[in-house]
Amino acid sequence: MTKAVQIKNRPTGLIILDGWGHREATQHNAIAQAHTPNWDNLLKDYHHTLINTSGLAVGLPEGQMGNSEVGHMNLGAGRVVYQELTRIQKDIDDGRFFENNALVKAIDAASNRDHKVHILGLLSDGGVHSHISHIKASIKMAHDRGAKVYVHIFTDGRDTAPQSALQYIEELETFMKELGGGRIASVTGRYFALDRDNRWERVKKAYDAIACGSAEFEAKDAKEAVELAYARGENDEFIQATVIPRNNGKPARVKDGDSVIFMNFRSDRARQLTEAFIMDDFADFHRCKTPVLSAFVTLTEYKKNFEKFGALVAYRPTSLRNTFGEYVSKKGLKQLRIAETEKYAHVTFFFNGGVEEPNDNEVRILINSPQVATYDLQPEMSLPELKEKLIDAIKSGEYDTFICNIANPDMVGHTGDFNACVQAAEAVDEALGEILATIKAVDGEAIVTADHGNMEMLFNEETGKPLTSHTTFPVPFVYFGKKGYPLKDGGALCDVIPTLLDMMGIEKPEEMTGTSLIDKA
């Protein structure tokens, strides 16, 4: 067993306020308008700076907003991690996408036997889970290889404006018309199709529409499906499953021999629907039909064991050596990861560079997120329980370091409900005050930062409607430590862990190209 190195300031922790961005203006800024005495005192008493969480600084295209997956990958890696969005788009631009082995195999397996190719994906340019340009490329590829293509679209309204689906549908319909192939077969809001919290009754609605052509609603085309949803009071995220029959009046459902291609590049929200299609022993809801597919392709690796069930992976993960978790584990140190359900994958899988298995001496605490339809109904979420568990862990003296995600700013921010966001900010402030007081009492230190912005801007000035997506504003970085070192400006997420290691008195590994933001000059 590796002999543990002796670290300074035990425990030294990282507290990620998910979606807590910085914006000078106070209008439409829930953080600025909330009563946050602990946060105000933290900024008054401790050195702080702002860091970048979007665009090229986190391996995304210039100007692209960051997100939780990207943020936690960059954080845990201590280097800029070039994201799947960028990687796949580059392949499309270079033409390599159209030669991808998994995609070619799936398309040809269906088309050579006169079966159909069904493409699933979140239709938007939000760039968080998917991108419309990728979906268009997959349609073109399947069409050019002789396949008949049906598209099952999931509407966004979360990483985009709440009622923006029609512009993406028009773009896709125009593209398919010019191409001479492709047809939208169903429309479902991401709330149902892309659940990640085991709300299987939601996923079933999407599955039934895609696999069985069965849904509560029907429309003559995708535009009408969205317009009818708006008339029912549903925004894009919550559009109920709607099938669009073919000219013969029958739905274009997935049948035996067809191939399915899931075009989301982010894994966490694509897993549950994928399981319903590929797992023989699936039991989370009754499947109306279980089509025997020629192939099921996941654009990226959604889960290690999915290939055991026959799934093909178009883009395998790039390997990241010496992420924070792996590195401190090699040093013999004990680490804690703690989050509630909505962000659990982020402080584990994504923070570890896409590795599912825990490192040696890596303890994980999962707090169940509340079972409510949307988090504006419970802005405190499960933070009171998370706070108590973390405080107990800090007091126990067991851990050398910890990574904690506080989900409220992002999850409540996505609802666009300003009053609920103010309540969420105040709940975060109260919990943060107690956590930091405990760290101080045991002579520990911490970094308080965020993975991206959200709650600091809740109004879309272009549409005049609530802004429910992330932002490109910088986020705070606070050094909660005893030494009072000033901080360097101009940092990014890749610099956070090198700073944490510096605080622990541990030299960073050579793979980490980020630098410590502590200015000891």
Curated annotation (Swiss-Prot):
- Catalytic center residues: 68 (phosphoserine intermediate)
Question: Record keywords: Protease included?
Answer: no
Q: Which residues bind substrate?
A: 129, 158-159, 190, 196, 266-269, 343
Q: Which InterPro entries match?
A: Alkaline_phosphatase_core_sf, BPG-indep_PGM_N, Metalloenzyme, PGAM_B_sf, Pgm_bpd_ind
Name the cofactor(s) required for activity, per the record: Mn(2+)
Which pathway does the UniProt entry assign to this protein? Answer: Carbohydrate degradation; glycolysis; pyruvate from D-glyceraldehyde 3-phosphate: step 3/5
Q: Which residues of this UniProt protein bind Mn(2+) 2?
A: 18, 68, 451-452
Q: What EC identifiers does the entry list?
A: 5.4.2.12
What GO biological process terms does the UniProt entry carry, in alphabetical order? glucose catabolic process; glycolytic process
What remark does the entry make about the cofactor?
Answer: Binds 2 manganese ions per subunit.
For the ligand (Mn(2+) 1), the binding residues are: 410, 414, 470
Q: Which reaction does it catalyse?
A: (2R)-2-phosphoglycerate = (2R)-3-phosphoglycerate
**What keywords sit in the KW lines?**
Glycolysis, Isomerase, Manganese, Metal-binding
Pfam (any one): iPGM_N
Instruction: Provide a Gene Ontology MF annotation, just one.
Output: manganese ion binding
Any single GO CC term annotated in Swiss-Prot or TrEMBL for this entry: cytosol
CDD domains noted in UniProt: iPGM
Q: How does it assemble?
A: Monomer.
Q: Which family does it belong to?
A: Belongs to the BPG-independent phosphoglycerate mutase family.
What functional role does this protein have? Catalyzes the interconversion of 2-phosphoglycerate and 3-phosphoglycerate.
Query: What's the protein called, per UniProt?
Result: 2,3-bisphosphoglycerate-independent phosphoglycerate mutase
Q: What is the lineage of its organism?
A: Bacteria, Pseudomonadati, Pseudomonadota, Gammaproteobacteria, Thiotrichales
